[in-house]
Amino acid sequence: MELTATESPALARECAAEAVAAFERYNSEYRAITRRAPTRFEERDWQGSQRDAVERIELYSHYVERTVASLRFRLGRDALDRELWSAIKQEFVGLIEAMPDAEFRKTFFNSLTRTFFGTIGVSPEIEFVALDLDPLARVADYDFMATYANRGSLQLLFEEVLSGFRCKAPWRDFDRSVRYVAGEVERHCATLDEQRAATRVEMIRPVFYQLTRAYLVGRIVGRDWHLPLVIALKNTERGVLVDTVMTRDADISVLFSFTRSYFHVDLERVGKALLFLKQLMPHKPVSELFTVIGRAKQGKTERYRELFRHLQTAKDQFVPAPGERGLVMIVFTLPSFDVVFKLIRDRFPVQKNIVRADVLRKYELVFKHDRAGRLVDAQEFKLLRFPRRLFDAALLHELRTEAAGSVHEDGDDLIIDHCYIERRMTPLNIYLREVGPEEASLAVLDYGQAIRDLAYTNIFAGDLLLKNFGVTRNRRVIFYDYDELCLVSDCRFRELPAATSDEDEMRGETWYYVADNDVFPETFIKFLGFDEVLTPVFLKAHGELLTAEWWRGVQDRIRANDVIEVLPYGAHRVRVASSA
């Protein structure tokens, strides 16, 4: 039944109000989960922290699906009436325009309409155009900073800073932690030859929690200079202490990396805090900052906005990404923009014993799992519209012939039905060919550490070929090829059986039974392709990775529910306090 003229405005107002209320319920529950973090830290409940992280990630899609179902029931046959949805959008604007972080609500509205209509590209009459969604354009004033004046002593200054950390757990040795922070700051300032004294310290009041650590985030301010400041806190069985102090841009960047789990930080108004973080890390995209503080959907919206704003002036074309051709994914990039696009191929070679649904599940696993600073955050996008002229001819041919299930054409446009977007890195095999011996050795050492770090968080990369790892600007080795990724706990790590006869020894194929989940670590070294210089470097530091015993030991710890810490800092990057 068609709506009457008097019914339509009333229904539009009701639907807009329901959408606003749904977001408020989502946001309230999101913040309630986030506010568990201090208690998890105080009680050293690390398993609880991990559960909270997954629960919070799943919350957004849950509320979108529930709201769509409710609105579909309310609207009935008019659920796809675009004129009605245009009216709902206008009513929605009136309801949210005075609210803080209004752009978050617009993003939520877009999620609803895109679910209803399966929008390809942009439909301005029923959604908010991403290019116009700037969450930092109208940031409401918000008193979220604490300022501590330097009254002549760094020790007194940081005594006041640490006293501002409210925690039910006792300090293990408060005075020692104060001395450590003051000493580290003084030492770093000396390396900068900075003679002008720090006049104050500015700290974000809400604490940043990430699994087993709490972080106090702010900056040290002097006359005409400032330094970023992050103080990492650890809660041991004997109490809380300062674990490390970070004042270097590179170290702060690693902490707020696209490879780490999201922070739990309860910000009443997000935009103002994002502006401050952007000042601390001016080279980090706003999209990554939104994502790493846990606002993943807004981070995704920002990435879309950054991309399409860049395309308005870009002169280059999309081309295949550097590196070897993928067997499961087609990977391409825009050289002038620092991301790659990954599309699932229509067909996989016989040696890949997987189907498309398996690949989707692997990426979903990574999205919800502790990435340990070693897995790139892959954002899933659907129904992206690009002018076909932006694609290199060879790439366009490959997409048409090998990814027809993920792309289609509409007039002069190419529609990408499904893809993942990730930060671009230099493939490790290419990096090792391009750098000198010292840099290559450091990369090989970090490659081995990456395998360890992933194992500690119950992730086995599966395919350890160097081409499946990348190197970031901070020279961190990151894994980014997920089609063979699995849980360490699901594998059976075995020693190679000894040959029982000369005939077995001479066979070209495997003569013993191998189950799907069998892994033989002794064979890893054959596939890595290290030269005669780098092989001993790897074996000296990480030789135990080639033993089934080491992997079974990790499995035992996982089954015992041990939380093995993989921190965004360490002796090789920043000094860590004595915190045994």
Residue ranges and their predicted role:
Residues 341, 350, 460-515:
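Catalytic activation segment of kinase domains across protein kinase-like and atypical kinase folds
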Residues 506-575:
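C-terminal region signature
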Residues 364-381, 494-529:
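Active-site-adjacent segment of 2-oxoglutarate/Fe(II) JmjC oxygenases
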Residues 453-459:
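Protein kinase catalytic-loop region centered on the HRD/HxD motif
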Residues 187-434, 439-442, 446, 456:
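Conserved ATP-binding subdomain of kinase catalytic cores across diverse folds
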Residues 2-251:
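Noncatalytic N-terminal accessory/assembly modules of large enzymes
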